[in-house]
Amino acid sequence: MINTQGEEGSLRKKVWNTINLIQANQLFVHSKNIEIKYFDEVKNKTNIKILPEILSLCVLNALVPNSAMLLVGGHGGGKTTLVKLLGRMFTGMRLEEIENSIVRGHPQLTEEKLTGTLKLGKLMKDGTEEVVWRQFVTGFWKIIDEVNRLTPYSQDILLSLLAEGKVKYYDAITTVEKYTLYSTINPQDVGTFELSQPFLDRFGISVPISMPSSNDLSLILTGKDEKYTGYDELIEVPKILSIDALMEIWYYVNRMRFKTEVNNYIHAIIRECTLCARVDKGNSENLRPSSGLCSGCHFNTDINICNKIDSILSVRVAKDLLRYSKALAWLMDLNEVDVNIVNSIAPYVISHRVNYRERELEKAPFWGNKYEFTKHIIEIVNKRYFNRKPCYDIATRFRDGVPNEKDLDTLSDYAKNDLIVKYDILPFCKAVKAKKYAKLAVKIDKSVKSGDLTSLTQVRDTLINDLEFPNRAYLINWCDQELYKQTVSDFTFKYSHQKDVWVEIATEFPNLDQPIKEALSKRQTKQIRTEDVLIETNVTGTDESSIVNIQISGGANALKLRSLLESLEYLEKE
């Protein structure tokens, strides 16, 4: 039997051990810290935990599936060394292997040196183009040193990897299923190229690397000289985790719950930075706050965000805010993500992806520091979000089909000074005030409270076929979420039983034969969706002892599948 709770706790302890070991052995010395605010449910109050900023954020990046991170700072700050050591500890790869897979950015770096080369023997003998992929492409732990020295063409190759998980060379295409990527950047370096906004947007998080303080330098100088002795891979930089273990951590991180207000708050961050009363910032080429767009505008005040930002924030930013918040909440062993956790991580997720109005950015006390200015922006967003709280409550009542008589009047008052209420909340509430919407919303609510899965499934099927129903997407999602909550079941088994599981499921559900077979065939995470069943599989590795997670949710067939899996003695139900 597999003790999944003990396994999760053991994995978390190993991650903390990595942080402690790097600090204790002085493998990376930097005194700058990050304050993490979180709500302690036991003591019923908000607490603060102090963590080493650079090291902790680099570790968080490894806990997020298929993640990419930018380390921004001058040369000699230990950026590349740190991620090499983390690669050794998190994957068990030798330092020499990690070194061989590093891409060193420079303008002469060709596509062949970055991605792969043709097998010359086959090409000359048979005329066949067979690609031998570079270790950077095939390896799990990827490092790009000085990414801003890559030409725009080389950046496009990496963009394909980050955006689609695919790399192309000649007519060959390889899929990069799972990876963790780190890129270093020295903004002051000569001979560099500008990184495009779409390219920067693919990096989920970034951290500024400042030079060590006097005390840090003292510790560094009195410590061991790695140039002379090297690193002891058994004691100083031991293997603590493996790729299989990291895949298991990804599964646990993805399952982290988050409060409803976190959903609203992340929306607020994105929309505060994107909305404008005059133009669509995403499609406006010349009109920007920095070019005089905000002159004479009613919303051009110190308490607004829109007049301080030239660019927009993409949907990817919203997803990354949640991903990294989940990773941080999991690492701190919290039950769920709250707004405090999002606030702690937001400056590092946003700062490298946004273009601020220079006049605002260069004011005291920021002096051009995008990270500090982003923290200031998040503080404003936070205040405005809590001032707007009654409007979210009104929107919830409209969603549930039970609005109050004066709710629209209240929203109209807020809309005079709040762009989110004016362009998002108020139009939404007006759109769903129809009687047929309220009637169906109340029906869904009753089905939820009574646990009537059949009724929920019927409502969902009706909505799928009715393209004109107001706020249809929300109601379908509501049904899906409630079906998920009432039927979700998690199972764990060893990879040695993957064929048995496949046969059992395929025998009872022939339509799942091929999808299940493919999902369990290699290390990967897959979702399989039928009309009323959602299956998520997570194969951490293909060794006999590797752990496989499978989650079932949906309607009547999901319950039938759950009963089948519960009857298998080699499966552990969580």
Model-based region annotation:
Residues 106-137:
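Short glycine-rich substrate-engagement loop in P-loop NTPases that contacts/grips substrate
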